[in-house]
C-alpha cells in the first residue's frame, strides 16, 4: 500500500506545529518554515490558501494521499447531512487513526505500522488495511503477542485517561478500545494538532471531482 515517505520535519516546520507528536520537536532548532526564504511571510492567493488547508488536513492524518482525499469526498458529497462533517469523519474513523487515538502508538506513523504489520484486530479479526473505516460499536484490540511490544506498553503508560476523546472508550489493561459513536465535527477538530478549515478543503475538491 502506498504511503508518504518524504521529510516529515519539513512538513511540521511549514505549519509551525509538532503535528506528528515526535519526541524531538523539529521546531526547537528551526522555528520557521523550510527553504531559503522561510523567514519571510508571503501573502497567499485564495488558491494558495486552499492548497495549504488541504495539506494541513493530509498532515494531521499521517500524510494521507491525494487519491484518498478525492475518494473520501466522492463518498460523501451526495449524501444527506453535513458534507464537511462526514468528510472529516472518513479520516478520523480510519483504523490507523483510531489506533493512535486509543493510545496504542505514540505517533500516527507508528499506528500505521502496527496496522500494516498485522498487529491489530477489529472485532477479533486481523485487519491490516490502514484506511479501514470503523463504525460505532466496532472494537479495536491488539493481538496477544503484540501486547508485549515495548513501544505499545510505553505509549499506553504515557497516555492519560482524560486525554481520550469522548467518542471512544479504552481498556488499557486489556489493550482494547471501542468507537462508541460517530464523532461530531467539533469533537474531531478538537483532536487535530492544528486548525484546519475543512469547508475550504471540500470547496477545493468540489472543483476537481
From Swiss-Prot:
Domain (S4 RNA-binding): residue spans on this chain: 93-156
Keyword Membrane belongs to the record: no
Keywords recorded for this protein, A-Z: Ribonucleoprotein, Ribosomal protein, RNA-binding, rRNA-binding
One of the protein's GO biological processes: translation
Gene3D superfamilies named among the record's database cross-references: Ribosomal Protein S4 Delta 41, Chain A, domain 1 (1.10.1050.10), RNA-binding S4 domain (3.10.290.10)
Database matches in Pfam families: Ribosomal_S4, S4
GO CC term (a single one): small ribosomal subunit
GO molecular function: rRNA binding; structural constituent of ribosome
Function statement: One of the primary rRNA binding proteins, it binds directly to 16S rRNA where it nucleates assembly of the body of the 30S subunit. With S5 and S12 plays an important role in translational accuracy.
PANTHER family: 30S 40S RIBOSOMAL PROTEIN, SMALL RIBOSOMAL SUBUNIT PROTEIN US4M
Family (UniProt): Belongs to the universal ribosomal protein uS4 family.
Subunit-level organization: Part of the 30S ribosomal subunit. Contacts protein S5. The interaction surface between S4 and S5 is involved in control of translational fidelity.
Protein name in the entry: Small ribosomal subunit protein uS4
Organism per entry: Chlamydia abortus (strain DSM 27085 / S26/3) (Chlamydophila abortus)
Amino acid at each position: 500500500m502506498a504511503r508518504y515517505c518524504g521529510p516529515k520535519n519539513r512538513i511540521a516546520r511549514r505549519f509551525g506545529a509538532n503535528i506528528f507528536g515526535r519526541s524531538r520537536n523539529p521546531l526547537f532548532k528551526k522555528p520557521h518554515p523550510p527553504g531559503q526564504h522561510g523567514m519571510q511571510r508571503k501573502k497567499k492567493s485564495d488558491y494558495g490558501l486552499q492548497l495549504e488547508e488541504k495539506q494541513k488536513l493530509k498532515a494531521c492524518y499521517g500524510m494521507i494521499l491525494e487519491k484518498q482525499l478525492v475518494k473520501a469526498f466522492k463518498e460523501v458529497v451526495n449524501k444527506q447531512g453535513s458534507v464537511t462533517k462526514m468528510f472529516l469523519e472518513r479520516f478520523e474513523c480510519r483504523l490507523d487513526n483510531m489506533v493512535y487515538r486509543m493510545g496504542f502508538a505514540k505517533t500516527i506513523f507508528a499506528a500505521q505500522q502496527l496496522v500494516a504489520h498485522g498487529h491489530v484486530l477489529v472485532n477479533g479479526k486481523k485487519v491490516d488495511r490502514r484506511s479501514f473505516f470503523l463504525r460505532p460499536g466496532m472494537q479495536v484490540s491488539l493481538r496477544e503477542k503484540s501486547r508485549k511490544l515495548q513501544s505499545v506498553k510505553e505509549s499506553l503508560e504515557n497516555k492519560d485517561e482524560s486525554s481520550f476523546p469522548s467518542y471512544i472508550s479504552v481498556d488499557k489493561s486489556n489493550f482494547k478500545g471501542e468507537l462508541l459513536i460517530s464523532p461530531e465535527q467539533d469533537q474531531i477538530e478538537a483532536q487535530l494538532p492544528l486548525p484546519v478549515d475543512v469547508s475550504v478543503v471540500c470547496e477545493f475538491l468540489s472543483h476537481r471531482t
